[in-house]
Amino acid sequence: MNKILEKIQNNTTILIEASAGTGKTHILENVVINLIKTKLYSINEILVLTFTKKATEEMHTRILKVIENAYSNSKTNEILKEAYEQSKKLFISTINKFALHALNNFQIETENYSKYKPKEKFSKEIDEIVYDFLRKSDSLIQALDIKDYELKVFKSDAKKTEEIVLKIKKAYERDTTQELGDWLKTQTAFENILLKKEELIKDYNKIIEDLDKMTKDEILSFYNKHIQTGKLEIEYSKENDIFKIAETLLKNKFFSTLIEKETKKNSKLSPKELKIKNDLICLGINIKHEKYKSEDNRNKNRNNLKQYVILKVEYKILKYIEKELKKTIKSTNTIDQNYIISNLKNYLKSEDKKLLNAIKNRYKIILIDEAQDLSLIQIEIFKILKTAGIKLIFIADPKQIIYSFRKADISFYNKEIKNKINTDARIVLKINHRSSKKLIGPLNKIFNNIYNNAIADEIEKIDFTNSLPNQKNDNNKIVINGQEIEGINIITTNTESEEDIYQKTALTIKYLLAYGKIAENNKIRNIKMQDIKVLCRGKNEINLIDKALKKEQIQTNKTQEKFLKTKEFSEIFYIIKCLDRKQSFKTLNYILSSKILNVPWNLQRILIKQDKICLIEEFIENIIVLLEKNEITLINAINKITFEKNLWIKIANITKDQKIIEWAKNKINYKGLLIKEGKLENLKTYETTLEIISKIYHKEQNIQSLISTLESLIINEEPEEIEEKINNINNDNESIELMTIHKSKGLGMNIVFLLNTTPIENSNFFSKKNQFYKFYQDGKIEYDFFKLEENKKYARLKILSEEKNIFYVGATRAKFALFIIKINSITSKLLEIAKIFTIDDIKHDFNIHEFIGQKRFNKKKYNTNVNTKLIPPKPIIKNMFKKEYTSSFSSLTAQAHHKEFYENYDFKNINYEKETELDYEPGLEETLPKGKDIGNILHAAMEEIIFSTAKDTFDNFKKNNIEIIEKQIQKINSNLNTIEIQNSLAKMIYNILTYNIRAINTRLCDIEELQKEMEFLIKINPEFQKQKYLFDKHFEDLHIKLSDGYLKGIVDLIFKANNKIYILDYKTNYLGKNKEDYNITNLENTIKKEYYDLQYKIYALGIKKILFKNKKEYNQKFGGIIYLFTRAFEDNIECLKSKFENGIYFNLPKFNDVDLDKIILELGIKRHL
């Protein structure tokens, strides 16, 4: 710390470079406290800036805590006392919030006496400006210096008005208007084409005239002199449109061949042919005829002249938007994030320097956290502040530049920050306090290869320095079933299927939760959901992994999108604006082209051309009147606008267009359209949004107040809060947290799954959505709005550089373990650059099943009783579930462990319950013979016998129930119908019903609420068979083959005791002649051998789906499972009452273990006794 303070005293600007995990926030806190303690600066003179609201709040809390602790430890220190008393005056803020604070709190200096109200972006204002421009384009284009033909070309690039608006909005949000303007100035060749277009049109038509003088055979011969002889349908005609001519020269095979190809050997052109060829080449050069390959590497012609005009008009519209927004800012004092920063810069640069001097007098030193993310305009602001004598401390990690969409760039950082700070004013932090030694070693090697071996311009280069581990983390690790795993693990599949890799990732998380433990600071505990974070490249990955995890019954923190951010809200909001008389139907064009009205583009054009928009306006006027008189609700008003069939039929008839008339007759409302398309989530959002808006309207009582309230709701959302909600994320300890890699920045996480399945060609600069290439060349950042092939390689390097940083940020969040999901994507490319296979201590094909061994039996658990109710389920309608679509537990065990049987049996048609094969000892005489018949007789009798009859003496019980027993013996096996067997069964059943079971402290005959032979069906996950091959190396013994269908089961008895629900199953297995043969050890061995532990989990799953809504209910209301081995109850039951109950096995499965896929997978593990 002394070294840092010394550098601060001796330099005007300091740079602290801190790699991930090296404690830059800790350093920043200590710098602040030491600046105060050493009297270098008072607390009022220090300004701390960062990027997000969340980081600001965390930093504020931590710094105040440090000040408080320092004061507590030295209360005699007057400086610390003063700092503690004034600690709330320490200004810690985001850069944008500080800029807004400066504009709003130095009003005399800025001469702006109204406070600005911030909002994230001018989305709706831009919509209105663009729609207004399109409506008034005829009168505006002259003022904007847009020619008629240029506007026509611009509009031709979109099918709908909505597309034009969206395109302009995206262009504004990219914030590259200045760059586009600068680029357009360099395109003088295209401007010259437009200036002499009439002359070029004449040249083209003259060529056509010359061709018309040739016969068809002569033209074909002319063509064949350039290629191998072939047939071609040659078509051309005169044109008066320079853009069509440019298109023709590109796409017409005849013309493009004559321009591009040389004549074949031994072929000689006639003077006439030579003239036409030369004229075409000259014309092609004059209109910049070029052929390019598109981003997807298919041959595709590009008409750059047309694209130039589109971009030219786009630029002029963007400048018009800027002008109109300035009016909006002036009239409403509402300002977006871009204008906040640009306004601050303009005031600081003003000649009077009033604002600059005011800030200088207030703050003497500024600490800027995450300085690598500064945009050029933000860097310029700090350079201006530096000129006023304010000291700057930049804290940065250039490897974490991941906000290119905020205009951060490594060249800005290197050129404008790092290279302008003296070497002796720089500090590099090296000790990683976050990650374990098992992670730091291989990560150093990975990023050394990625960064230090990269080919890049010096100004674009990022230097990687190895991190050093903190010894206190050396023994931190993840253990699965007693086996330690590597710090870095690669998850891959044998296929390149996205679905497979997501499913395998979800299953890995599932079993990590079931079998994994964390060892930290010599303590070991189970892995919890909050330990695991899944970091995704974007929203698409979040949606896919969320879907895969929920298939495995694992909850995530992904929530539904807030209604203010939905498309449904936007469209309803525009309709509401149409109901405001003051708006003068400004938003009508938008709603006409929106999906909520679904008006065909041809009809919109006819309405505009024939000036019939007034019909819709008149209709809405009538609705406004009804609304004002309270004769119609707001929802009904909106519904009338979106679906008034008579209105649309009337309008359609005016057009006399049969297709439009048919559309009007068959028009369905928005709800019907969503139902037809199966978009039920959108329907739910639409109805919820209507309900919320309706409630606000009911409170406000008029449309103007409603609009004002809704706009306030939008405006008052903090930019960072909106950004955090984009991925629909919230925190919950009972769920797996999913977030983007961008949102994970600055956080430490125990276990990280890193997901980026985006192919590199689909990334930012190569997508069709992005309108330009950005790259570094000749000492400066360049933009190419044509996206030319020759610039693609430079743009690729630029995007790859950012992807390296995103990968770095994601990988360095982990404390204990990192799981990298590898598929044919950017991640694969980066791992290749990292030379991953040359690095030790990395598990290259991580498979969770290598670590899953035999699972221990759960220990007996007792829970506090809570009130619950046993509700018998409705009977299963058996004909709904065909036999070929059901399986049983017995069929699963047969499939899993009897290969020969499996290979010769069609399990689609299985419908039997397997009985345990028992060794028979001929020398022993038993009253009740072994085999399945006795079991079936007992089960059938127990179903009919009324349990309460056992409260009486045995003789009376036998008298009341012997006929039932005799009937069942006769029915199942008449050879067993003897007096001895009847009496033995009666005695056994009586003993079972009158025995006080310790687990429930009651007798079965005393139970009042019970359900016998309860049937259940569990839906089989059809994806299981696919999941199996994801781990195929570990399934050699698993022969289960399940079709999409159901697993059926029948539970012998479900009952309520002590306010809990219990399951009881009768087992007639023969374990020996003596009662001691049914001790707990033998019972556990039998349970294990026969896989009964998996059977009772299936029973638990069956009733869980029927009786319990969630984990909380399961834990509170489920008492457990009792397996009652009936042969232990043949004689006197008094002998059972030993320290351990003979013949009774009890267990309470954990909620997470009651999972069908997990049970089936455990069946595949061969057990050894």
Swiss-Prot record:
Mg(2+) binds at H939, D1052, D1065. Residues 459-746 form the UvrD-like helicase C-terminal domain. Residues 1-436 form the UvrD-like helicase ATP-binding domain. It catalyses: Exonucleolytic cleavage (in the presence of ATP) in either 5'- to 3'- or 3'- to 5'-direction to yield 5'-phosphooligonucleotides; Couples ATP hydrolysis with the unwinding of duplex DNA by translocating in the 3'-5' direction; ATP + H2O = ADP + phosphate + H(+). One of its GO terms (molecular function) is ATP binding. Its EC number is 3.1.11.5, 5.6.2.4. Binds 1 Mg(2+) ion per subunit. GO terms for biological process: double-strand break repair via homologous recombination. Gene3D superfamilies: 3.90.320.10, P-loop containing nucleotide triphosphate hydrolases (3.40.50.300), PCRA, domain 4 (1.10.486.10). Keywords: ATP-binding, DNA damage, DNA repair, DNA-binding, Exonuclease, Helicase, Hydrolase, Isomerase, Magnesium, Metal-binding, Nuclease, Nucleotide-binding. CDD domains: RecB_C-like. InterPro entries: DNA_helicase_UvrD-like_C (IPR014017), DNA_helicase_UvrD/REP (IPR000212), P-loop_NTPase (IPR027417), PDDEXK-like_dom_sf (IPR011604), PDDEXK_AddAB-type (IPR038726), RecB (IPR004586), Restrct_endonuc-II-like (IPR011335), UvrD-like_ATP-bd (IPR014016). It comes from the Bacteria. ATP binds at A18, S19, A20, G21, T22, G23, K24, T25. Its cofactor is Mg(2+). GO terms for cellular component: cytosol; exodeoxyribonuclease V complex. The active site is at D1065. Residues 1-839 are annotated as: DNA-binding and helicase activity, interacts with RecC. The N-terminal DNA-binding domain is a ssDNA-dependent ATPase and has ATP-dependent 3'-5' helicase function. This domain interacts with RecC. The C-terminal domain has nuclease activity and interacts with RecD. It interacts with RecA, facilitating its loading onto ssDNA. Heterotrimer of RecB, RecC and RecD. All subunits contribute to DNA-binding. Interacts with RecA. NCBIfam families: recB (TIGR00609). A helicase/nuclease that prepares dsDNA breaks (DSB) for recombinational DNA repair. Binds to DSBs and unwinds DNA via a highly rapid and processive ATP-dependent bidirectional helicase activity. Unwinds dsDNA until it encounters a Chi (crossover hotspot instigator) sequence from the 3' direction. Cuts ssDNA a few nucleotides 3' to the Chi site. The properties and activities of the enzyme are changed at Chi. The Chi-altered holoenzyme produces a long 3'-ssDNA overhang and facilitates RecA-binding to the ssDNA for homologous DNA recombination and repair. Belongs to the helicase family. UvrD subfamily. PANTHER family: RECBCD ENZYME SUBUNIT RECB (PTHR11070:SF23), UVRD / RECB / PCRA DNA HELICASE FAMILY MEMBER (PTHR11070). This is RecBCD enzyme subunit RecB. It comes from Borreliella burgdorferi (strain ATCC 35210 / DSM 4680 / CIP 102532 / B31).
